[in-house]
Amino acid sequence: MKGLYYITHIGNLPSILEKGIFSHGRIRSESIQNTTIYLEHLVNKRGNKYTADGENLWHYANLFFQPRNSMLLSVIRSKGKQNITVLRISNTVLQRQGVFITDGIASNKLTRIYSRSEGLEVLQAQQEMLQSDSWTSWNHSDKIRRQLMAECLVPNQVDPKDIQRFIVADRSVASSLWVRLSSSNIQKLVVASDIGSNIFTPFK
């Protein structure tokens, strides 16, 4: 596993680089300025689902094991791919206390939430699909679309030091982002999807 992934609007990067990736609950409670990319009714559903620790999903920053999923497709269609970045996060966050793992998009009623050890075992059975570069097999299956959005739920926040790189749609976006990051003295690797990653490829 190369890492975990977080999908966000490029406009959120200054806050993320300074403070980290916050849970939705913390963003609300601290009135943090944030450009939302997800549909409100889906976010609200997450407030009504709970982990074994008694916390609802708003308590967690949610990371994907496979970023090339239907959630990314949805936000690209609604916000434009030039405004979206995928952050690769070190998989060391899996060792955090209180982490949970899901076998699909967490808000779905069919999705189960597991402890870290149980969840990693469950995802072993989905490993081939989660690591696949092919979009043809899952495009017509609701079950596989759901499973491709398996999540790692990290309590409260993901620290800036755990962010490894930013993946964007093309070289133009990468060049602009690199200038912004350099001026902030942030040494992170910016990768354009058309030269260093295929995450955005299906959406060209």
Language-model-detected regions and their locations in the chain:
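Active-site-proximal loop/hinge segments that shape catalytic or ion-binding/gating pockets
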Residues: 1-62, 70-204
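Short, conserved catalytic/metal-binding motifs centered on acidic residues
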Residues: 66
